[in-house]
């Protein structure tokens, strides 16, 4: 019996299935995360879906290879163990980010979805654990905005009739609420305001895109994964590849990683460093 092809590479607790030299398979980001994990740097646990999956996805009429979903579920279970939380669990929920990762850097050309796993069942526990209702509803409205834009509109191939996409329309809803309240900054919005916005956003998404924002964590996850693969052939990415001479057949990896938050308060932040 032939050995099943490995499509998912874990990094957690100072160990990694991959190596820093495996950029062709894991993409630059995935290879870097694997190497940092091996070096003992405190990297939040996650896993990388290989560039091979992207290649097979497009070869097979945008269908995933056999065994991928089982490998993702197996890797997620290991991430849950490493983080002491469970994806979709109503008591100790794990949230993840879903990011692209080509072997050569393509900054801003492909898609990202953050806060994946926030649902009506996990929000109460996140509020209880963080003791910060405002942060949780801010994360939730960001998820709705990002997911509607990246997954439900762009990846679905929906072209806005008036040229204004769903993200622009949701931003207008937020700006209108700020004007009504006399606020100057997004940070002026209260927990109640953000909860109200999340409800408004979901209604707007349903009205414009004719679909409900998903309340199932795994539907959110696979929507995000698919959107990253779709973004490899998005207009921006295709144009960038032509300019930079990046071959189409390289494909992108997908990195699913435990969330790190930069919006929990004035002493919280995230960023990108270049060396």
Specify the residue positions occupied by each region the protein language model found.
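Nucleotide/phosphate-binding sheet-loop regions of phosphoryl- and nucleotidyl-transfer enzymes
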Residues: 1-275
